[in-house]
Structure formats: structure tokens, C-alpha cells
């Protein structure tokens, strides 16, 4: 079990895997159930004055995340990210003055994300309907309406 980290709901997780838009990894809050992760992930328990959802929203923009991590991360020969869990916390993060304000901001953006997801599903269903209607109106060669 020493090769794994325990992640609790509300913890902040740093994924030390380079991605196209995030070459230094990503930072997310665990909004789901507790679980375990490999040592390739840095797991952080937030302080009493810091809200995990706010921290995730703070790092939502690729440019801000990359600017935060760039000076802290060294890239290895195989494009691995060489950074200790402690070093990942060395950068400056501008938090809202109070925990309640951070929580409200995090909830606001969560609500927006949920609304976007809802509208995306509606859009996807309308795209399927449009395709079906076009196929019925304009059948392929040799087909009848």
C-alpha cells in the first residue's frame, strides 16, 4: 500500500503526467468518492482556509496552470515530470480572502459547468434528431421515403 496515496473527497490532486495543453500536469479537486492513486499523483489535503473547488477553478485555465508549474517542474529525458509533492506547493496561489467566498465562487462555477453539460446533452440530442430528419427527407440513392 506504500506505493499508493489515499485521496479523500475534497483533496487536491496533482497529476504528474504531461498532456498536450498541460505539459507540466494538471491540478484537480476530488469531487467524487475516496480512493487510492499511484505515487505519480500528488495528494494534498486543503487547509481550513482553502476550498478545493476554488483551487481547481483557479487552475482551470491552461495558461495559469502552466505558468504556475513551469518554474517548479523539471522534465526528464523520457518527458517525465521530475517534481516532488512538496515542490509542487512552492508556487504562489492567490486565494479569495475568506473560505466562504472561495466556496461561493467554486459553487458558482460548478453550477455553470452543470448548466453547460445540460445544454451540451440537449445539443447532442438535437444533432441526432437533425441527422435523422435529413436522412428521412433526403434518402440515399435507391431508397424510398
Located regions from the model:
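Feature detects amphipathic, helix-rich regulatory segments
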Residues: 1-145
Amino acid at each position: 500500500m506504500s506505493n499508493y496515496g489515499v485521496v479523500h473527497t475534497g483533496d487536491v490532486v496533482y497529476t504528474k503526467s504531461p498532456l498536450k495543453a498541460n505539459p507540466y500536469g494538471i491540478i484537480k479537486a476530488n469531487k467524487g468518492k475516496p480512493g487510492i492513486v499511484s505515487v505519480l499523483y500528488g495528494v494534498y489535503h486543503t487547509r481550513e482556509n482553502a476550498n478545493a473547488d476554488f483551487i481547481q477553478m483557479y487552475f482551470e485555465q491552461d495558461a495559469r496552470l502552466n505558468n504556475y508549474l513551469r518554474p517548479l517542474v523539471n522534465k526528464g529525458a523520457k518527458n517525465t515530470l521530475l517534481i516532488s509533492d512538496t515542490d509542487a506547493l512552492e508556487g504562489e496561489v492567490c486565494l479569495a480572502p475568506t473560505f466562504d467566498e472561495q466556496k461561493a465562487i467554486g459553487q458558482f462555477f460548478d453550477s455553470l459547468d452543470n448548466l453547460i453539460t445540460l445544454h451540451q446533452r440537449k445539443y447532442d440530442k438535437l444533432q441526432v434528431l437533425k441527422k435523422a430528419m435529413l436522412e428521412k427527407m433526403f434518402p440515399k440513392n435507391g431508397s424510398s421515403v
